[in-house]
Amino acid sequence: MEMGSNSGPGHGPGQAESGGSSTESSSFSGGLMFGQKIYFEDGGGGSGSSSSGGRSNRRVRGGGSGQSGQIPRCQVEGCGMDLTNAKGYYSRHRVCGVHSKTPKVTVAGIEQRFCQQCSRFHQLPEFDLEKRSCRRRLAGHNERRRKPQPASLSVLASRYGRIAPSLYENGDAGMNGSFLGNQEIGWPSSRTLDTRVMRRPVSSPSWQINPMNVFSQGSVGGGGTSFSSPEIMDTKLESYKGIGDSNCALSLLSNPHQPHDNNNNNNNNNNNNNNTWRASSGFGPMTVTMAQPPPAPSQHQYLNPPWVFKDNDNDMSPVLNLGRYTEPDNCQISSGTAMGEFELSDHHHQSRRQYMEDENTRAYDSSSHHTNWSL
């Protein structure tokens, strides 16, 4: 009896505990697997019940909110379009795609228009004509777009502020230089010289390149050939040797009956029509033919200018600021016209023969037979 009684109560609680634990574990595992509700009698059960109660409350709240905004519709009167399948933008702001661009709609009994930047309806006076955005938004947008940032302004000022003055100074200097060059040159406007006369700017004169081309520079103005810059001629004529008085030389050339020296009477008698002035050089004789005697000279210009020649030994420059270069021994220069064109001498052999005869008459005089060698 005692053993039974001992074993009974000893066994009873053990079996009860084992049975309770087995049922609890099976029910717990089954609840986790199949989603069944599990209720516990101890503290764990209370927490489970409270958690289940919280879940049910959340579901109720969610269901209520879902029911109130479950089907979004367009808020324009007379539309009520279902926006469930529309884009998120239209469903959020409760407007359909058509009425979002309509110029005038009625919302809550007021004529309004949907602003695409504000994403809400505004009254019509807040819009400008056909603009889809309100005036306030457009003003801010244009201000941000047109007004540069202060940082960009400072960068531009620091980057281009030093370059612009230098460019301006260079450009100004270039303009002044070209203007002064044009003033000094003074090219002819209507008539030009022969094509063989090369005209160059003062900045690179030809006599700096080749001194023999000093007489090929000139310009035509008022029927005469003259250098435009007296300072340039003064610097070049400092090294010249020859006649110092231009008026004296001009008077010698302009007087057809005044002899050049004591031994050239035959020369003047043979040339009654043209005034001829002969000069000898190492290359041969050079002849200048004047169709008319030149008139009284002005300050810097002559109508029919005499010509200037440069020789190895003697330099003859009747007029300081007038000049023309000729090729020796085979070229004749005629200034009968105002143009002063170049003419090739067709009778240079005759001129040389005549020159030799004149030299013979000079060399042997009737009174004294002294030899006069020309330089």
Swiss-Prot record:
Cofactors required: Zn(2+)
One record GO biological process: regulation of leaf formation
SUPFAM superfamilies for this protein: SBT domain
Ranges of Basic and acidic residues composition bias in the record: 345-362
Compartments reported by the entry: Nucleus; Cytoplasm
TM annotation in the entry: none
Listed Polar residues bias regions: 363-375
Coiled-coil portions: none
Pfam families registered for this protein in UniProt: SBP
Cellular component, GO annotation: cytoplasm; nucleus
Listed name of the protein: Squamosa promoter-binding-like protein 9
